Amino acid sequence: MTDFHRIKRLPPYVFEQVNRIKAAARARGADIIDLGMGNPDLDAPRHVIEKLVETAGKPRTDRYSASKGIAGLRRAQAGYYQRRFGVSLNPDT
């Protein structure tokens, strides 16, 4: 197997370190709500799951939103493109 020398220079995976810290805290009896990596360790409430199932079965719920987004954010993005790339964008289209 090839030894990739660049891999050895990478820092340790942060969530590996966090997992060790959490495990040690739990071993000491700490009550931890794990929100690491966006993966809660509690199940979703039953009523939330039921509403998701109900909504997923409705026609046209599998489309993107028609929302144009936040007007201030669109203006900021257009301004960034103008400053950075010299490109003029209309934030309303």
Curated annotation (Swiss-Prot):
InterPro entries hit by this protein: LL-DAP_aminotransferase, PyrdxlP-dep_Trfase, PyrdxlP-dep_Trfase_major, PyrdxlP-dep_Trfase_small
Per the record, its GO cellular-component terms are: cytoplasm
Subcellular localization, as worded in the UniProt entry: Cytoplasm
- The keyword Electron transport appears for this protein: no
Q: Which residues cross the membrane?
A: none
Gene Ontology MF terms in the entry:
L-aspartate:2-oxoglutarate aminotransferase activity
Q: Which reaction does it catalyse?
A: L-aspartate + 2-oxoglutarate = oxaloacetate + L-glutamate
Please provide the record's keywords in A-Z order.
Answer: Aminotransferase, Cytoplasm, Pyridoxal phosphate, Transferase
Instruction: List the EC numbers from the record.
Output: 2.6.1.1
Obligatory cofactor(s): pyridoxal 5'-phosphate
The family annotation for this protein states: Belongs to the class-I pyridoxal-phosphate-dependent aminotransferase family.
Q: What is the annotated quaternary arrangement, including any partners?
A: Homodimer.
Q: What is this protein called?
A: Putative aspartate aminotransferase
